[in-house]
Curated annotation (Swiss-Prot):
Signal peptide: none annotated. Channel activity is activated by increased cytosolic Ca(2+) levels and blocked by luminal high Ca(2+) levels. Its main location: endoplasmic reticulum. It is a multi-pass membrane protein. Residues 254-291 are annotated as: Disordered. It comes from Rattus norvegicus (Rat). A 1,2-diacyl-sn-glycero-3-phospho-(1D-myo-inositol-4,5-bisphosphate) binds at residues 118, 122. One of its GO terms (cellular component) is endoplasmic reticulum. It is found in: Endoplasmic reticulum membrane. This is Trimeric intracellular cation channel type B. Pfam families: TRIC.
Amino acid sequence: MEYPWDDLTLAFSRTSMFPFFDIAHYLVSVMALKQRPGAVAAAWSNPLSSWLSAMLHCFGGGILSCILLAEPPLKFLTNHTNILLASSIWYIVFFCPRDLVSQGYSYQPIQLLAAGMKEVTRTWKIVGGVAHANGYYRNGWIVMIAVGWARGAGGAIITACEQLLKGDWKPEGDEWLKMSFPCKVTLLGSIMFTFQHTRHLAISKHDLMFLYTIFLVTIKVTMMMTKDAAVTLTPFEDTLTRMLFGRQQQQFSLSEKKAEVKPSSNGSASSASKRGTEPPSSAKRHAKKED
C-alpha cells in the first residue's frame, strides 16, 4: 500500500531540472559573475572571456567531477541544449537593453525563488555525481563522496582557479583554505547520499532527496531574508572536534591568543621605558652644548 508521503517524495525525485530549474541555476550563477567589480566592462571589451567565465560558473561542478574521474574536462560542451540555454542567460544578463534583467532580478521575491530553485539543482547534482562515481568505482565510497561533492559545489573551486589565472585570486576566497557554508552542506549531503547508496543509511533515496532539498531551500531562504550569513555548522563542527580531538585544540587556540597579546604588551612596556630613559640623555646633550 502506497502512502501520500511516498507518492509525494517519489514524484519530487522524478522532477526534471530542465528547463526551469536549470534556468534558475544559470541566472543565479551569471548574476554572481556580473556583480564582480569590472565584470560588465570586461564583458563589453572581451565578450569571449566573459562567456568562458560564465560557463565556468554554470558548469564548474561538472568540469571538476570530470577531472577527478579522468574524463575530458570539456565534456560539458557536448550538451548543446544546456550550453545554448546558459549562453542565452549570459547574453540577456550582460547585454539586455536598459539592463532590464538585472532590474527585475533586484526584487527580493525573484531572488528568493531563483536561489531556492538553484538549491534544488544542487541535490540533483550530488545524486548524479555519486551515481556517476559508482559506475567507475563500485561502492568506492570515498570516491563517491568526492565526486558528489565536486559535482554539487565544484563551481566555486573552478571559479577560484579562473580568478587565479586572471590575477584576481584572494586567499580568503579560496574554498580549499576556507570552506563556505554551501560547500560544507554539499559535502555533508554527498556523505549522506553515498551512505544511502551503499545501504549504510536506512532511508530511501527519494525520501532523502526530498528532506535534504527542503533543508537546503529553508536555510538559503532564511539567510537571504534575514540578510545574515551566521547560519553555519559551527555547533556541529565544535562537537565533532571535541569528540575526535578532545579539548587540546581549544587550549592550543587560547595559548596562541595569549602569545599574541604578550609581545604587544612587552613592546609597549619597552617603548615606555625607552621614553622614560630619553630625557636624561637629552639633558646631558644640552649640558654639553652649554659647556
